[in-house]
Swiss-Prot record:
SUPFAM superfamilies: BH2638-like (SSF158504). Belongs to the UPF0223 family. It comes from Bacillus mycoides (strain KBAB4) (Bacillus weihenstephanensis). HAMAP family: UPF0223. It holds the Pfam family UPF0223. The lineage of its organism: Bacteria, Bacillati, Bacillota, Bacilli, Bacillales. This is UPF0223 protein BcerKBAB4_3787. InterPro entries: BH2638-like_sf (IPR023324), UPF0223 (IPR007920).
């Protein structure tokens, strides 16, 4: 995409890579769909890096402003979808 992902420059390179993979998965949910287990695994790693709800909301807002995609709505949809199913928005 032609925009800059919201990143915290205090994160390690490994953490940045994990967060970017999560952002890419959110994009794929809107564009094609992603297997629920894969998305939730990336979300769990994201939550290890960003454990605070306030920080998650801030990142979601920034991500939505640049991409048009909502992390919150995507994860809510994933929680509604059965195991081994595709999450699609």
């Amino acid at each position: 995409m032609e925009y800059q992902y919201p990143l915290d420059y205090n994160w390690s390179n490994e953490e940045m890579v994990a967060v970017v993979k999560f952002y890419e998965a959110i994009e794929k949910v809107y564009e094609k769909g992603v297997l629920r287990e894969d998305l939730m695994e990336l979300y769990r790693r994201f939550k290890e890096i960003v454990p605070s709800k306030a920080a998650e909301k801030k990142i979601d807002k920034e991500f939505q402003e640049v991409s048009g995609y909502s992390i919150y709505r995507t994860i809510q949809r994933a929680k509604e979808v059965a195991e081994k199913k595709i999450v699609k928005m």
